[in-house]
A protein has these predicted regions:
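Conserved beta-strand hairpin/beta-sheet module of binuclear metal-dependent hydrolase folds
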Residues: 2-53, 131-143
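Active-site neighborhood of phospho(di)ester-bond hydrolases with catalytic His/Asp-centered motifs
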Residues: 36-38, 56-63, 82-86, 121-124, ...
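Pocket-forming structural segment of enzyme catalytic cores
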Residues: 107-109, 115-131
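Active-site-proximal loop/helix segment associated with metal-binding centers of metalloenzymes
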Residues: 5-27, 93-99, 149-150, 198-206
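Short, glycine/acidic-enriched loop or turn micro-motifs at the edges of active sites
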Residues: 41, 65, 88, 124, ...
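Active-site HxH/HxHxD metal-binding segment of metal-dependent hydrolases
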Residues: 21, 34, 41-116, 196-200, ...
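Metallo-beta-lactamase
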Residues: 127-206
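Short, flexible loop segments at the rims of nucleotide/cofactor-binding pockets, characterized by
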Residues: 11-17, 34-37, 58-61, 118-121, ...
Length: 206
């Protein structure tokens, strides 16, 4: 499976605040089309990156506005479904009102050219956070659950530090250590590099 990354820039809004942010958007491609992961900020940029390839669907790792607010527009543009874990429904409604989405479930699988994309529910940064595992490519799209240097932020509403640590210990860090981690923001890392720092995360509290 071909994994493409590009960066978009815009605003993250939550709890009455607003911050500048750069987001990693991913396109998972094959002969059978593409899936768009977390399209953000700039619809024209996303459409240009996709080009004339058929879109199979849009998969969201969570429903903070910087990851999800383009999804209804792009879903309509391409005539495809938007997939989101329902535990993030309240956050989704803050950005997108009653726009429809298809609920994701833990261990759900998508397929592209015979290769699997497996969804793991990893709450903590938000209640409905998920990561996407591509075992054939030894890659994890971690959204905002895990970054190079630490877990996703848990200082805002609907987030919980103890829960994200549990998700890392019980789900993410059970994957092979050489699994490449492609996060929602910033640079890549590996499962092993971050698992080795779990005690540091816990000690510092973020």
């Amino acid at each position: 499976m071909k994994i493409e990354k590009f960066v978009t820039s815009g605003k993250f809004r939550l709890d009455g605040g607003e911050w500048d942010v750069d987001n990693n958007v991913y396109i998972l491609g094959g002969k059978g089309g593409v899936y768009i992961i977390d399209p953000s900020h700039n619809a024209e940029q996303v459409i240009n990156e996709v080009g004339d390839r058929p879109v199979r669907g849009i998969i969201l790792t969570h429903a903070h506005n910087d990851h999800c607010e383009l999804a209804p527009q792009l879903g309509e543009h391409y005539g495809v479904e938007v997939h989101l874990h329902p535990e993030d429904d309240e956050l989704w409604k803050e950005s997108n009102g009653d726009a429809p989405y298809v609920p994701l479930t833990d261990n759900q699988q998508f397929e592209l050219d015979g290769e699997k994309i497996t969804v793991f529910h990893t709450p903590g940064h938000s209640p409905g956070c998920v990561v996407l595992h591509l075992p054939q490519d030894n890659v994890l799209l971690s959204g905002d659950t895990l970054f190079n240097g630490g877990p996703g932020a848990t200082g805002r509403k609907y987030s919980d530090f103890d829960v994200i640590i549990e998700s890392l210990r019980n789900v993410v860090f059970n994957l092979p250590g050489n699994t490449k981690v492609y996060p929602g923001h910033g640079d890549e890392t590996t499962v092993g590099a971050e698992a080795a720092r779990i005690d540091e995360y816990v000690a510092r509290g973020y």
